[in-house]
Amino acid sequence: MNLTAPKSAIVIGGGPAGLVAAGRLAEGGLSTTLLEASARLGGRAATEHREGFDLNQGPHALYVGGAAMRELRAMGIDLPRWNPTSVRSVFVRGGKPRRLPGGSLELAGWLTAVARNRQEGLGGLSVSEWLRQSLRSERARATAGALVRVTTFVADHDALSADVAAGQLRIGLLPGVRYLRGGWQSLVDALAARAERAGATLCPRAGARAVEQSAEGWTVTLDEQILRAEVLVIAAGGPKDAAALLGDRSPTAPGPAAELSVLDLGLDSLPRAARHFALGIDSPTYLSRHSAPDHRNGVLLSLASYAHAPREQLEAMADTVQPGWRERVRLQRFLPRMVAISAIPSPTNGGLAARPAVDRGQGLYVAGDWLGPDGWLVDAAISSGAAAAAAALRSPVFATA
């Protein structure tokens, strides 16, 4: 056996992680094929365009200070986006909208400290423990918990490690987030176009049925075809999807998945024009305008519950924040129990830094929002996809002489 540079790669999964990996591998000179089981690329980043509205698979935001934005800049991708930050916010407590969330003075000082100082040693603490140790006021803790929910998409703060929350709050506060014009499909389309320009072959409707290691590297079996490559990147879904293909070789999930329920409302206009954003303080709910201010075909509101509440609870929040919305609605879509995060890093497992490694050895890599030490949500997906490609390009593989 001799060491040689890899010449070919197969990427399974056409979401952001897989598209980034495929593009980077093709740029590095590898003959790269991406396989996506569904008819369209994007995974949970795909967007549905209906009645003039761009409907993402749940509320999505791009963190300006996050790993995804850094990688997009490095790839020369500049997506049309807008800043949703608004002073037109309300906080819902006791079923009533309020201008101030409660515990504001103590909370402001704490948030300033979180934004300015990188918090160390939080991987072994739960969010609940961290907030109890950091804030004296119960109201301040409740508001901090609401901010953690909206930045992490996780309602179970006993299960989530505090390092995730601290990192998300820090980049969420400054430099903040942006929403993408055209929905997150614009991100998917840009990554796909770049991968194809680099030479990658993107194959929708091509589901991998089995993978096996072979003397030449890896063999992937499809319904009517067998492909072989020296490098294999699994970027399809979450831990269960990886395990279905890899069996015992699959990384162990660092924790359970996090789910949310989403209600999208396309309105002719807002009954309360000054209310663009609302956060539930004593319930794990959220409301935000997800159409740009200059959108001329109505207003899109996205409501979410991080505890997969029934539709009626989200409608009740809309009644509280935007009374009269039912007379102006022309589109409704309810998505129950969607996967928001494939696996939650727990404090008992060491938190974010202890997530499974992307490089699994022998030309095998796994990418997604639950792998690698860097980032959360799409930041983790894109970061792990880039890390998989970088590791493959610098790692020689064994091949027969």
Regions of interest found by a model, annotated:
Residues 2, 290-401:
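Conserved flavin/dinucleotide-binding core of flavoenzymes
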Residues 4, 209-310, 355-356:
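Mid-domain catalytic core of redox enzymes
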Residues 7-34:
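N-terminal Rossmann-like FAD-binding beta1-loop-alpha1 element of flavoenzymes
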Residues 17, 40, 239:
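Conserved Rossmann-like nucleotide-cofactor binding loop
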Residues 26-50:
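Glycine-rich FAD pyrophosphate-binding loop
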Residues 46-54, 62-112:
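A conserved beta-strand/loop capping segment in the N-terminal third of enzymes
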Residues 96-97, 106-179:
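Rossmann-like flavin
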Residues 167-218, 222:
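Helical element adjacent to the flavin cofactor pocket in flavoenzyme catalytic cores
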